[in-house]
Amino acid sequence: MESVAKPATTKEGSAKQAAIVVGVLALGWFAIQVAFIPLFNKVRGGGSDKKDDDVNAFTPDT
């Protein structure tokens, strides 16, 4: 006879299952954020312009 795992029905089992689901969702959200950082920066307008680098360059007083 095969033993089949029973679903978690206790409060402790339900809390553990909920914590795992929340953790997986958070990890998935983080992975999506990391994977699409270049796209998000472009959409938000946060990309660095090459011409702005000259303005911010340090020039010593001579």
Curated annotation (Swiss-Prot):
Residues 1-17 are chloroplast intermembrane. It is found in: Plastid, Chloroplast outer membrane. The keyword Transmembrane applies. The keyword RNA-binding does not apply. Its main location: plastid. GO terms for cellular component: chloroplast outer membrane. Coiled coil: none annotated. Residues 41-62 are cytoplasmic. It is a single-pass membrane protein. Keywords: Chloroplast, Membrane, Plastid, Plastid outer membrane, Transmembrane, Transmembrane helix. The chain crosses the membrane at residues 18-40. This is 6.7 kDa chloroplast outer envelope membrane protein.
